[in-house]
């Protein structure tokens, strides 16, 4: 009992199991608990914009080398493009080999499209040009109010660059942002105490609303997706970590709390503040973490990429829509663009899938109705894969920059160096410790 009281990941795991039981045994009660999960995610999202701002500004201002900022950003984008392309291709290959939709013989005309209208309408408003233009905020207050990560990141980079250019004149502002960072991570510690409550409510709602029977009806698709996501993590991300001189399984154990929080909430964004904190304590470069992790939540969604190609071909197979190899390559090309607009929030992948089907044209958009019931059950694997992928990205780019403290990282993963994982008991958050050179 003492270990349960001190261990966040055990509390969240227990909450997920209890939530699933409540949703299964008392569906109406489970469905009514949705506000618990939504409230927790809103509390976390409330902190994301200011944390990204404080981390990026202090990292860039203390680094002082603006060319390095651009270099880190370009390396991050190149890494994202390679890994997400591989993820898209893997989903395509698995869909071709496993054929999870074969034999369903669904007539698109018989599908009820009313339930997916909100997704298809939303997809039409999220084209590639709109997405790129949306990186530039109308005003700073609006970007922070809406929690738009890319807009906040752009402003933070400019603010940090200006602060670095001011040198000693900007020191009072830098000290203020350092102090702000300390306060924000203390608040994160308070909020994460509510993670079990949020996970319980979110899981109870998912099972109560959609039911276990929905899972069984499309079991082959769900099994394919979970197996493919696991394969990607073990093979691709494991290979990247091996290049960095680290063990994948020790890395997964290190971020187990974040994984269970994401499992319960179905949103990788819910663990963003803790993930940034963990990566800095692992020994990753502070400027790299500040740039790569927030960017990754729009450009490095590995789990979502696997889902998009797998689900697209599933719909084609289920509706007996013939797709040639050339058309599959066209789908891959379209997804290379549309997948970058998938927000790391619950339902973002489904909206992007609707946009992709609309752009491709030959696969019926009505087929989305087949996925509506099970999409929520697949969102856990999407979100967890996205989370792990962004953590590995910060390690890889730090290694690429020659700024990964490998000795510390190995020691932290081996458990021989305390990682101070309890947020509420951490006297000095990573934004301060990293900037002052206190990584050990």
From Swiss-Prot:
Localisation per UniProt entry: Cell inner membrane
PROSITE patterns in the record: NA_DICARBOXYL_SYMP_1, NA_DICARBOXYL_SYMP_2
Keyword Transferase: no
Predominant cellular place of this UniProt entry's protein: membrane
InterPro entries reported for this sequence: C4_dicarb_transport, Na-dicarboxylate_symporter, Na-dicarboxylate_symporter_CS, Na:dicarbo_symporter_sf
Keywords: Cell inner membrane, Cell membrane, Membrane, Symport, Transmembrane, Transmembrane helix, Transport
GO molecular function, one term: fumarate transmembrane transporter activity
Region feature (Disordered): 419-440
GO CC, any one term: plasma membrane
GO terms classed as biological process: L-aspartate transmembrane transport
Superkingdom per UniProt: Bacteria
TM stretches of this protein: 8-28, 40-60, 74-94, 147-167, 187-207, 221-241, 288-308, 354-374
Topology in the lipid bilayer: Multi-pass membrane protein
Family recorded in the similarity comment: Belongs to the dicarboxylate/amino acid:cation symporter (DAACS) (TC 2.A.23) family.
NCBIfam families: PRK01663.1 (NF002461), PRK13027.1 (NF009587)
Listed PANTHER family: AEROBIC C4-DICARBOXYLATE TRANSPORT PROTEIN, PROTON/GLUTAMATE-ASPARTATE SYMPORTER
Annotated function: Responsible for the transport of dicarboxylates such as succinate, fumarate, and malate from the periplasm across the membrane.
Protein's UniProt name: C4-dicarboxylate transport protein
């Amino acid at each position: 009992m003492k270990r349960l009281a001190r261990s966040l990941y055990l509390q969240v795991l227990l909450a997920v199991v209890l939530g699933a039981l409540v949703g299964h045994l008392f569906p109406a009660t489970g469905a009514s608990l949705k506000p618990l999960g939504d409230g927790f995610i809103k509390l976390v999202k409330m902190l994301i914009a200011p944390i990204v701002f404080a981390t990026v500004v202090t990292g860039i201002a203390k680094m002082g080398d603006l060319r390095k900022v651009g270099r880190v950003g370009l390396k991050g984008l190149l890494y994202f493009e390679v890994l997400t392309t591989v993820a898209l291709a893997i989903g395509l290959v698995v869909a071709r080999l496993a054929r999870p939709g074969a034999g369903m013989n669904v007539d698109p005309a018989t599908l009820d499209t009313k339930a997916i209208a909100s997704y298809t309408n939303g997809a039409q408003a999220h084209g590639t040009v709109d997405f790129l233009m949306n990186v530039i905020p109308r005003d700073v207050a609006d970007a922070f109010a809406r929690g738009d990560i890319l807009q906040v990141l752009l402003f933070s980079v400019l603010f940090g660059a200006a602060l670095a250019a001011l040198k000693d004149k900007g020191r009072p502002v830098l000290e203020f942002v350092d102090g702000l960072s300390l306060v924000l991570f203390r608040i994160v510690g308070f909020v994460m105490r509510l993670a079990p409550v949020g996970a319980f409510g979110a899981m109870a709602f998912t099972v109560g609303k959609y039911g276990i029977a929905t899972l069984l009806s499309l079991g082959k698709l769900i099994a394919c997706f979970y197996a493919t996501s696991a394969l990607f993590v073990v093979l691709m991300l494991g290979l990247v970590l091996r290049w960095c001189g680290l063990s994948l399984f020790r890395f997964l154990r290190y971020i187990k709390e974040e994984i269970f929080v994401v499992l319960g909430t179905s949103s990788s964004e819910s663990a963003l503040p803790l993930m940034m904190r963990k990566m800095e304590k692992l020994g990753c470069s502070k400027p790299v973490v500040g740039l790569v992790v927030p960017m990754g939540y729009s450009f490095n969604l590995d789990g979502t990429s696997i889902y998009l190609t797998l689900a697209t071909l599933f719909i084609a197979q289920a509706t007996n829509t013939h797709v040639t190899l050339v058309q599959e390559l066209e789908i891959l090309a379209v997804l290379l663009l549309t997948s970058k607009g998938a927000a790391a929030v619950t339902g973002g992948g489904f909206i992007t899938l609707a946009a992709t089907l609309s752009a491709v044209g030959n696969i019926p958009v009505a087929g989305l109705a087949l996925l509506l019931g099970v999409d929520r059950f697949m969102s856990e694997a999407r979100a967890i894969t996205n989370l792990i992928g962004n953590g590995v990205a910060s390690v890889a780019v730090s290694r690429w920059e020659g700024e990964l403290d490998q000795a510390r990282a190995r020691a932290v993963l081996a458990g021989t160096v305390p990682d101070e994982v309890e947020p509420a008991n951490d006297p000095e958050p990573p934004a301060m410790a990293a900037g002052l050179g206190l990584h050990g």
